[in-house]
Amino acid sequence: MDGALERFAPLKLETNQLAVTLVDLRDPEQPVQASYRGGEQAYPASVIKLFYLVAIHRWLEDGKLEETAELRRAMRDMIVDSLNGATGYLVDLLTGTTSGPELAPNEMEKWYYQRNAVNRYFASLGYTNINVNRKPWCEGPYGREMQSVRMSKPNHRNWLTTDATARLLNEIVTGKAVSARRSAEMMELLKRDPSPDSGTKNDQAHAYTALALPPGSKLWSKAGWMSECRHDAAYVELPNGSKFVLVTFTVDHANEREIIPAVAKAVVQEFSARK
């Protein structure tokens, strides 16, 4: 991380604007993890959709939701195309809440308790220092969504850490998220084609960790980007057989496309040197 901080010093990349967690999966039964500021909260942008994906599969597995074509379409659009509208629809299904006009105080309390259903699920699994109860907004919250923002600081936004995100992605990769079958279904949605001619430079497969990958690499990922942050949560398989989860969060450098690939490149070089 020192190298990345030094390289991007002219861009005023500060130590508190970068967080990274790396999980070596050479032996999936004995993963080795290292992190830099891995427990620090950051607004996750669309990386939060990874948590909603797992929650949807848990609800389906438990019979809390009916598996419909529309639900499947929304899951696909949330992960593959990162659509906020699809995510909002799934948050409604997960929590039994909807956006809309302001509510009376007692109704708002009930609404907010229901909205925290996903938080309670991840807390039951031992996840800490995260908040997963907000829809990703395009223009901002209104009505009861804004009511809940005002009443719930410091949890007025979604929050994740790179450690928590890496843990979840690792569980998906190793078939431990909900079930092996459901983890495999999640992996299908997260699969990217990092080859140069497979899409535009701005999509999730080409504008983040993928920029550092050598030919022949395989990538599964969920990126997040908005005005104040740029993140990527990636699982990579290199041509030499090395496998790792790499989660990189950057804050206040949303338009700096080179920071995440620079971190990934250092990791790739280290893992590529292995025999």
Predicted regions and their residues:
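Short, well-structured active-site flanking segments
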Residues: 58-76, 87, 179-183
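Short glycine/serine- and small hydrophobic-enriched flexible loop segments
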Residues: 54-62, 92, 167-174, 269
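Extracytoplasmic
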Residues: 13-18, 31, 37-39, 43-47, ...
